[in-house]
């Protein structure tokens, strides 16, 4: 199946309180998935988001993206999409910071298990959420499963930002553990090819571990490749 040629001009927000759940918000799609017997590769292509997308949920996994909140299948393709809206993760649940709570934030897709090609982000991407781990990028917060990110751009006016004060959990003294920030991808388990970052990456919070980069904050599998990319 395909979703193409759609334009969103409205603001989108999610604010769930659901411990142990996954909550996703996107300008066009919250979650993009397909069944194993669905036939051809599923595609989201040539869609545009102009609205602000905000996720302030207190959940196990928070996903927010300008076009797609979460792409959860390796055969799902996102291509030729544009985000012009602001993307925000701003959960304030300080006293519930626990291990294995994840925050994925991206200009095009928050959490991505499929390929992304030819996409452009023009909007600011930011997180002020208190989650154990945050992955945030101008195009995608995280890319799983050896997928390829090809020919994508985070433009000049787009800033990728994390900012909060370090606070201890009153119940078990847990703190925010790690952040990966990238101009294109926050954390990548695949290949990034011919992508460009022209925006600013600004890490202004205080977790235990920080990885920040113009193209990618953290490449999880050293066997995967980055080639032909430019941080301008």
What are these regions (language model features)?
Residues 1-232:
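Surface-exposed loop/turn motifs in large extracellular/passenger domains
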């Amino acid at each position: 199946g395909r979703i193409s040629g759609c334009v969103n001009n409205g603001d989108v927000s999610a604010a769930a309180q659901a411990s142990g759940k996954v909550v996703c918000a996107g300008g066009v799609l919250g979650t993009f998935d397909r069944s194993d017997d669905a036939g051809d590769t599923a595609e989201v292509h040539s869609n545009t988001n102009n609205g602000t997308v905000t996720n302030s949920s207190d959940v196990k996994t928070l996903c927010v993206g300008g076009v797609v909140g979460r792409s959860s299948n390796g055969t799902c393709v996102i291509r030729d999409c544009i985000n012009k809206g602001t993307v925000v993760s701003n959960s304030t649940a300080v006293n519930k910071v626990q291990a294995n709570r994840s925050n994925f934030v991206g200009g095009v897709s928050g959490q991505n298990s499929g390929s992304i090609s030819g996409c452009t982000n023009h909007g600011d991407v930011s997180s002020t959420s208190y989650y154990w781990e945050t992955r945030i990028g101008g195009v995608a917060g995280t890319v799983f499963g050896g997928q390829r990110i090809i020919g994508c751009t985070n433009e000049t006016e787009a800033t990728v930002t994390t900012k909060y004060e370090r606070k201890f959990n009153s119940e078990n003294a847990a703190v925010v553990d790690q952040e990966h920030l990238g101009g294109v991808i926050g954390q990548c388990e695949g290949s990034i090819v011919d992508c460009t970052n022209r925006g600013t990456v600004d890490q202004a919070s205080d977790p235990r571990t920080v990885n920040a980069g113009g193209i990618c904050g953290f490449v999880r599998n050293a066997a995967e490749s980055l080639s032909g990319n430019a941080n301008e």
